[in-house]
Amino acid sequence: QLLQFAADVATGMHYLSDKQFIHRDLAARNVLVGDNLVAKIADFGLSRGEEVYVKKTMGRLPVRWMAIESLNYSVYTTKSDVWSFGVLLWEIVSLGGTPYCGMTCAELYEKLPQGYRMEQPRNCDDEVYELMRQCWRDRPYERPPFSQISVQLNRMQEARKAYVNMALFENFTYAGIDATAEEA
């Protein structure tokens, strides 16, 4: 079901990109699950109906979901939404983990252009992580289009392979939490 959520979002983003809309805030917090467990993209507050958008005003931005070119040059395209999709896919697989946990925004500005990327979640299949890595390529034109991402995720769904190992996830969900904390 987790990969189906990702496939639903990719299909929705393919539609938006065909209409030349840039979402600019694609994240798990902006995906709603509706009837029949269909994931739908929400919160279009930062979206723009342009092929390329250059931000020229100040304001709060979702830094942990932003592509390198958006962080460095305030340039947003469908390919920067693809980067954000890779982060969203990481969120789905990690069952709501915080992207770049423990890193400051300043560290992201410094490390992402140097090639740093989030590690593969322990419960994540190599093929899913490779898709994330494709979304996080330095050069926007090297990132896959949403049409390709959608096809890839649907193909994975049809393979009926365990791309997210829930048994492994249970082994580290609460690691490092003091058992006596519940009693306090």
From Swiss-Prot:
One Pfam family cited in the UniProt record for this chain: PK_Tyr_Ser-Thr
Alphabetized SMART domains for the sequence: TyrKc
Coiled coil region boundaries: none
Gene3D superfamilies: Transferase(Phosphotransferase) domain 1
InterPro entries found in the cross-reference section: Kinase-like_dom_sf (IPR011009), Prot_kinase_dom (IPR000719), RTK (IPR050122), Ser-Thr/Tyr_kinase_cat_dom (IPR001245), Tyr_kinase_AS (IPR008266), Tyr_kinase_cat_dom (IPR020635)
Record GO biological process: angiogenesis; blood vessel development; endothelial cell-cell adhesion; heart development; vasculature development
Name of protein: Tyrosine-protein kinase receptor Tie-1
Organism: Danio rerio
Gene behind this protein: tie1
